[in-house]
Amino acid sequence: AAWAAHKYLMHGPLWFLHADHHTKEPGFFEKNDYFFLIFAIPSWLCIMLGMMYGVSESVAFGLGIAAYGFTYFLVHEIFIHQRFRFLQRSNSPYWNAVRLKHKLHHKSLTKDGAEHFGLLWVPLDWIRAQKKKA
């Protein structure tokens, strides 16, 4: 779901929010940061309404969105883009491959032509290549 949202929404009709993420603009915040609200609000509503009305599937769905959001924040914002200065180095072939794949995604500065939309999935041969570099 996250892969499809990134490829077909963020690199599609919502590019006006995502574009500044592919170019380095001055300042700490990006329009891309609005996606936090776009995903956090439905997550919160699913959890809250699910608890109020006893719909466990709604709570589970909301918690799933929240868990992905937390993972995204740690991996994408902290580890990959270094928006906060910790988790800067890694000796892990997997995490180095994740960082490389994301760097290749950012080679495209337009909404068309980008590749590698997933956050955590990396082909095994990429991990092996990073292992050889270590």
What are these regions (language model features)?
Residues L37-G50:
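Hydrophobic core of alpha-helical transmembrane segments in multi-pass integral membrane proteins
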